[in-house]
Amino acid sequence: MPHLLVRGVKPEQLARVSQPLVDELAAICQCGTDNFTIECLQTVGVFAGEVVPSFPFVEVAWFERGDNARDQFAQAVTKHIQALGITEIEVAFTTYSADQYYIEGKRCDRL
C-alpha cells in the first residue's frame, strides 16, 4: 500500500520507470518499496463514435499522509510519466480509512 492504478500508459513504458518511481515514492512515504502495487490497466477510450487512446490517468489509493507528502507524490508520478514523452497526466487520490481496510481479515486499525 499505496496502490497505483494507471491507465493510458503502455505496460512496457510503465515498466521502464517503475523502479525509479517506486524508489522515489518510498522515500516520500517513508516506507519500503515492497509496500507499493502498480497496476497498468488496459482500457479503450471512446469519444464521438470513435475509438480513441485512453487519457493518461493515475489513481492512487492509500492511507492519508498529509498535504506535503501528497503533493510530492503527485509531482513524482507526474515527472516519471512525463519522462516517457507523455505530456499530459492527471493524478487523483482515494484515501482509505484504517478501520475499513483489512489485511488477512484483520482491520488495519487493530494491527
Question: What feature does the model see in each segment?
Answer:
Residues 1-111:
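Interaction-mediating elements
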